[in-house]
Amino acid sequence: MRTIIGDSVNKSTKLKSDRFRSMWDGKIKGEKYDSPDFSSGEVNGDVLLLRYNLYNDEFESKKTINGNTHFVERTLSKVVIYKTNKYFFLPYYYKGGKNFNVGYLSLITELDSIRLYRKDEVKFQPATFSPTTIEIGFPPRFIKRKLFFIQKKEATPIQIGKRKMIKLIESLSLDIELK
């Protein structure tokens, strides 16, 4: 014999799982690649087919369309040209200079004493279940964001906010559009 509390918990759990299944088709939303297709690019002057895995922050390469996929070696000496952008494998600091990382930064512009970079990042967000019908649950998904960095002379690049980057570009009278 079931109790009222036991029945309500089972019905509630079934309702949550049914609602989640109707929302999620079994696929992860979003894309971990900049583009899922390989595009022509260069690695230190060698012409290859490339695609950029934003989630793992690495380039995948092929010599031919039907060739095997290889990963571009992540060293400071490698310069990757992908979709007309130059990517440098550099150490950098996130905001506040607390978190240090090493990865690919895309050069926006280079002036006498400063370089401006952009970094496209993808973070994986696991599924969230809504405990009630009022709250919203989400399927697992990749979330894209753009970060901006400034490098003075040969110092380590440091993240700056988009507003500060726009003000800097305006103060330097540069004709650059932040995409």
Regions found by a protein language model. Give the residues of each.
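General N-terminal leader/first-domain-start detector
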Residues: M1-V47
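Aromatic-patch recognition
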Residues: Y33-K164
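Long, compositionally biased interface segments
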Residues: L168-K179
